[in-house]
Amino acid sequence: MNIGIIVFSQTGHTHSVALRLQEKLSAAGHSATVERVEISGELGPGVSNFQFKTTPEVGTYDALVFGAPVLGFALSPAMKGYLAQIASLKGKQVACFVTKSLPFYWTGGNQAIHKMGEICESKGGAVCGSGIVIWSSARREQMITDVVERLCGLF
């Protein structure tokens, strides 16, 4: 299966999880490509003065995994904007993951995953799974492994 892993990553954390997922999917016999959503301008809690530098195309992939950080207790505005501009995800399996700093899922992680799924479903995508990595957790490595295993098992 040809799987696109499309991420927005400010600090490199989300991108590092995407690379681990790519490695696992490739080892399972899939063609997996990591692509980055890139922006210029300002982005932060309450600040969304940015423009897209890169917006990866989704049409060539059989399935997609979207990854983004939580920012200000919500999905990063860059990923929210990127997903909104996609014309269609019809017929595509979709999974999502987020990385976050605060220690509880309810401090933005659940909301961000819900928003990603909502947007993807509105574009016709079939959301089949998700994961949250809490970067500040002492269990971070185990969380990454668990999310990568779970998402890889979907395809």
Give the positions of each predicted feature.
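FMN-binding flavodoxin-like domain, especially the glycine-rich phosphate-binding loop
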Residues: 3-35, 46, 50-155
